[in-house]
Amino acid sequence: GELSHALAVEMFHEQADALKEGGVDVLWLETISAPEEFAAAAEAFKLVGLPWCGTMSFDTAGRTMMGVTSADLAKLVEDYDVPPVAFGANCGTGASDILRTVLGFAAQGTERPIISKGNAGIPKYVDGHIHYDGTPEPMGEYAVLARDSGAKIIGGCCGTMPDHLRKMREALDSRPRGERPTLERI
């Protein structure tokens, strides 16, 4: 639909201002697909005066729904008056796809921290409900690969439960940092 830049800024500003009044320290923007939407949020967050982090959701082709690539986002965030303190990817279609995107961010040579928040598996419709098929063990492996791919902020998105997060923490604590993985390994 049609949404003007000014209205998008106003909408993000209203939410960010309320969060600031509520005492938050950092604003978090995620699951964005359009660069215009990301820019409107950046402008609104500048008005509020709080640091922020932002992520986009990338598909199996390494692009957002609106065609943004990891290289595009890495360049885009550096153009804002107040860039995010960290940026990256969330959601998407599975660990291998988000890890490929993280490798794309790292390949740009960014010094800004990279975020990776992958889904716990692939969504399936089962008995009238959405169910994610990822078990905690693969999420632990994902966390290690995300770290080794260059992510500094690692978490989970859709379908991620406390057991997944525990396994991720356990894997990160128990396994030494490794070399940057190849696409074949991912």
Functional labels for PLM-detected ranges:
Residues 1-186:
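Domain-level signal for soluble alpha/beta catalytic cores
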